[in-house]
């Protein structure tokens, strides 16, 4: 029955005749087919993509405190904000000055001497000539909330207490410092503010730029053939180290599948003076390996606005699909 007939019956106070039942079923069926077709078309590009193995996961590292030693793990959960093992999160803790500005090994090279063990839901900090510091992995909500500053952007941090502040201050011996922790209910620093020229959308806590840094052991071997003093992977602080590929093959990787995790390239990693800090002594060199890297790893002139004169070593990734990964997992390039 047409719309005019239905409205006429309504004016007479009579009920409108119902649509035939078969017509409603048919309409629902057509809608389901249409939605299924749309979903299939959207999924089709992913389904038809080929997986090409490019290497194998050799190492996984979580760096709980920015600029302190990394914690090697055999497996990890990969969240949108980076690697996680239990309550141990990548760069969820940060040393700050009293005014909230971040402190890294660029200013305090001896931070790289602080090691961290995760045990019984606690972080155990150890450093040369210091008693160990034991902190719970979650701070009381009654602790002060700090306004922190990282590369010109604001972010919150929960104070980790006076004992932690005293421990870091006594070890570094320069000025008063405090330790803060990022909480998952806090707002991270967004990629749109960190990297406004790039078209990606993610958040990070206290990393420099991105949730993940991937490197290959072959690229480090290549660098060391040019170096008088050999560098360690710890100089470069990657989250995922890949073996079984050629040097700098990672420059060509866009989207990767590792375990059940899918990641997408954001940019190459522009290297800074932090790489010149010896991870074993905490002494800053200020020249190597930067000078050597600059001799053959500068960006194309067309990318100078993004990278300036920083040499490129390693690749930053965002997390497209969360999941888990482990040492020994094949690394697939999605092509």
UniProtKB/Swiss-Prot annotation:
Molecular functions (GO terms): molybdenum ion binding; molybdopterin cofactor binding; nitrate reductase activity; nitrite reductase activity; oxidoreductase activity, acting on other nitrogenous compounds as donors; pyridoxal phosphate binding
UniProt key word Ubl conjugation: yes
Disulfide bonds: none
Topology within the bilayer: Peripheral membrane protein
The UniProt record lists the keyword Ribonucleoprotein: no
PANTHER family xref list: MITOCHONDRIAL AMIDOXIME REDUCING COMPONENT 2, MOLYBDOPTERIN COFACTOR SULFURASE MOSC
Record note on quaternary structure: Component of a complex composed of cytochrome b5, NADH-cytochrome b5 reductase (CYB5R3) and MTARC2.
Protein name per UniProt: Mitochondrial amidoxime reducing component 2
Gene (UniProt): MTARC2
